[in-house]
Swiss-Prot record:
Entry-linked CDD domains: NAD_bind_Shikimate_DH
Catalyzed reactions: shikimate + NADP(+) = 3-dehydroshikimate + NADPH + H(+)
EC number: 1.1.1.25
Quaternary structure annotation from Swiss-Prot or TrEMBL: Homodimer.
Gene (name only): aroE
Lineage of origin: Bacteria, Bacillati, Chloroflexota, Dehalococcoidia, Dehalococcoidales
Organism of derivation: Dehalococcoides mccartyi (strain ATCC BAA-2100 / JCM 16839 / KCTC 5957 / BAV1)
Summary of the function given for this chain in its UniProt record: Involved in the biosynthesis of the chorismate, which leads to the biosynthesis of aromatic amino acids. Catalyzes the reversible NADPH linked reduction of 3-dehydroshikimate (DHSA) to yield shikimate (SA).
Family the UniProt entry places it in: Belongs to the shikimate dehydrogenase family.
Protein name, per record: Shikimate dehydrogenase (NADP(+))
Pfam families: SDH_C, Shikimate_dh_N
Catalytic residues (positions): K70 (proton acceptor)
NCBIfam families: aroE, PRK00258.3-3, PRK00258.3-6
UniProt pathway annotation: Metabolic intermediate biosynthesis; chorismate biosynthesis; chorismate from D-erythrose 4-phosphate and phosphoenolpyruvate: step 4/7
Amino acid sequence: MQTIPDALFGIIGYPVSHSVSPAMQNAAFKHCKLNYLYLTIAAKPEDLQNVIASMRPLNIRGLNVTIPHKIEVIKYIDTLDPAAKKIGAVNTIVNENGQMKGYNTDFGGFVRLLEHNRIAPAKHRFALLGAGGSAHAISLAICTLGGHLTVLARQEEKAKDLAAKMCLRFKGKAQGLELNEANLEETLAESDIIVNCTPIGMGNLAGQSLISPRLLRPDLTVIDAIYNPCKTRLLEDAEKKGAKIINGLEMLVWQGAMSFEIWTSQKAPFRVMMKEAEMALDENEK
């Protein structure tokens, strides 16, 4: 017999049906004997304000925030954790007695991914594709740890704005360029790590890549923040060229574990969450 959950949580984004977050968070709740439920909430940009407002009457205890809402959502929450304020993007919300507080765990998730793969940013030059919410957190992680960063985005102004924010804190460590073939070719020739923070390669954009295979080479490390599919077109092309490839699943689970700890004040069962996320991803790809 099912019981009514003591608290509701969820992930808001568009699209969001591909997410493995419900599987891993619900597994974590069960492991920790918490009678909580985590749901997916598909919300187009025009519906974002209403969904956040509904957290109060529906007593939704917390949310994860994903593409494309991580920056826009800041308008609709009451307070920001200092890290989220510094990053300028939110991926975790807590409903504290009707007050919405925003956090960012993408930063920590990416740092853990770098540590696990023994990547010391200070020794590398990064090409970062995209200038959205995840890119804000990842760019700050790269620059904080001493890496040199080039941000490439289709809207040149967004790339330059993000790079300028990094340069205010880390002089000379970042530049922003329009994402086009010429700039990609020049930037990748000088970079040894590529990070894709765009949705190109997932959902309706699966099978697509922003980078021509001819620009890839064996000495590159290619990181795709996308985890579903497990291997995007970019990662497949990079692997064929002999490059090291890393998908976004590990980062997802680390940031999800940090969100769990913010919501529950309990230590997250990381291994349980990783196993469940891998199983859910395998099921999604069948």
